[in-house]
Swiss-Prot record:
<feature type="topological domain" description="Extracellular">
    <location>
        <begin position="88"/>
        <end position="90"/>
    </location>
</feature>
<feature type="transmembrane region" description="Helical">
    <location>
        <begin position="67"/>
        <end position="87"/>
    </location>
</feature>
<comment type="similarity">
    <text>Belongs to the Casparian strip membrane proteins (CASP) family.</text>
</comment>
<feature type="transmembrane region" description="Helical">
    <location>
        <begin position="91"/>
        <end position="111"/>
    </location>
</feature>
<feature type="topological domain" description="Extracellular">
    <location>
        <begin position="159"/>
        <end position="167"/>
    </location>
</feature>
<feature type="transmembrane region" description="Helical">
    <location>
        <begin position="138"/>
        <end position="158"/>
    </location>
</feature>
<feature type="domain" description="MARVEL">
    <location>
        <begin position="10"/>
        <end position="162"/>
    </location>
</feature>
<keyword id="KW-0472">Membrane</keyword>
<dbReference type="InterPro" id="IPR008253">
    <property type="entry name" value="Marvel"/>
</dbReference>
<keyword id="KW-0812">Transmembrane</keyword>
<keyword id="KW-1003">Cell membrane</keyword>
<feature type="topological domain" description="Cytoplasmic">
    <location>
        <begin position="112"/>
        <end position="137"/>
    </location>
</feature>
<feature type="transmembrane region" description="Helical">
    <location>
        <begin position="168"/>
        <end position="188"/>
    </location>
</feature>
<comment type="subunit">
    <text>Homodimer and heterodimers.</text>
</comment>
<protein>
    <recommendedName>
        <fullName>CASP-like protein 0U1</fullName>
    </recommendedName>
</protein>
<dbReference type="Pfam" id="PF01284">
    <property type="entry name" value="MARVEL"/>
</dbReference>
<keyword id="KW-1133">Transmembrane helix</keyword>
Amino acid sequence: MSGGDIDPTAINSPKFRLIAVQCLFALTAFATMAGQNKNLAGPDAMTLEECGPYGCGYHKFAVFQFLVVICVTYWLFTMLWMGMYLIQKVPPAGTEFMIYAVFNVLILIAFSTSWTECNETIVDPTYPVCKRATGAKASIAFAMFTWLALCVSMMFTWKEWRDQNYEGLPIFGDFSSFMPGGGGGGMGGGGGYERPSDVNTQTYA
């Protein structure tokens, strides 16, 4: 790839910067959980006894493993997405919104189930699973921050898609006439899938 293929102005886009923030949040979320190799009081009394006096690691908990997998996957996605912004190869706004929506649901499930597990009590009613597990608690917090930032990205992308009359979702074509505020040509109405050249730097009030 030559230097001329890269658009340096992409980093000025609020959407690009939001993705960069999410990249750091997701990296921190999975790294702190992956480093939690002891001090978890669970997932059950038998397993805790096997782990010994220092407690269990995150790998003994299915929900914590799920959190790590989702955050690693989203971190890799954000790295790829930032690269696509820089080379101006981002998919249509409709496609981008749907991808964000899928990750939004997965991250919400990951951090909410992990938070619930973290507050479970196995041995003592006053001693939750994550009482001494600062890494796990930090991981869940950063997963939540990732989700909140992703919600903002979805809002920006939704507004962008709305401004394009909901065109550009490859699976359905142009279905703007079925969406609020749309006035396009229906399911096969000839809407294009190319995004305007100024989308990467567009801001919204």
